[in-house]
Amino acid sequence: MGILKKTIFIGGIYGLGVYIGAVAWRLRKDVLNYESRQKSDLLIPNSNSISIYNQIADKYSRKITREEIFSGIYFLRYFLLRNAKGDVLEVGSGPGTNFPFYKWKKINTLTLVEPAEKMREIADARAKKKVPPNVLYRQFADLRQLPPNQSYDTIIQTFCICSQEKAVEQLNNYRSLLRSDGRILLIEHGKGKYKFLNRILNAYAESHYESWGCVWNRDIEQLLEDSELTIDSCKRFNFGTTYVIEAH
């Protein structure tokens, strides 16, 4: 390696070290500032989430697709959602993010529930291109709008607990809508396995919520335990912050 290349290489390593050090210093400063304010109560999502999702609807898919490919979440969606079959209910469906992951030959009906109007509009437009004509497609703004006495073979929810004010009540509703041999498939994010990471999530939870309508540090395991669901499996990824759950 020539002198010039060595100089560039060493300079690059030095610059990267300075950058990482600056980021670490900023994180530490923000965490300590947050903890010095003694905010012991974790943020709980509220109805403002809907207005936030309406505001970010147009950029939502573009933004999360890049992040999910990088973090591996894209592939978690692929391997979990291919198990959906029969009459499928997806709650918090957003702009139709999960359409590419469904095995349509296994699906008879697809019912979406999405409270954000802008997200519903995008999903309806995508459904015309993505959902096969032999699959009955419907969309509602609220679970209470579902046809009476309706039940489902598969209930899907991906990254929704973070924006649900009454998450346990919502999970319990799914059990009442599930057929006796049905499955509930969830991908969620929340509190991680490591204290240092959770301190960072806590410090930035409020600003992240204001931008994305998402409380990213909720205790997912505790919420599941408080619900009436029977958990068949719960696998965690990304330092424990991403949860892949199968339940009934």
Swiss-Prot record:
InterPro entries: Methyltransf_Superfamily, SAM-dependent_MTases_sf. The keyword rRNA-binding does not apply. It is a single-pass membrane protein. Its EC number is 2.1.1.-. Its main location: mitochondrion. GO terms for biological process: methylation; mitochondrial gene expression. Keywords: Membrane, Methyltransferase, Mitochondrion, Mitochondrion inner membrane, Transferase, Transmembrane, Transmembrane helix. It is an enzyme of class 2 (transferase). One of its GO terms (molecular function) is methyltransferase activity. It is found in: Mitochondrion inner membrane. PANTHER family: METHYLTRANSFERASE (PTHR42912), METHYLTRANSFERASE TYPE 11 DOMAIN-CONTAINING PROTEIN (PTHR42912:SF83). Probable methyltransferase. This is Uncharacterized methyltransferase C3B9.04, mitochondrial.
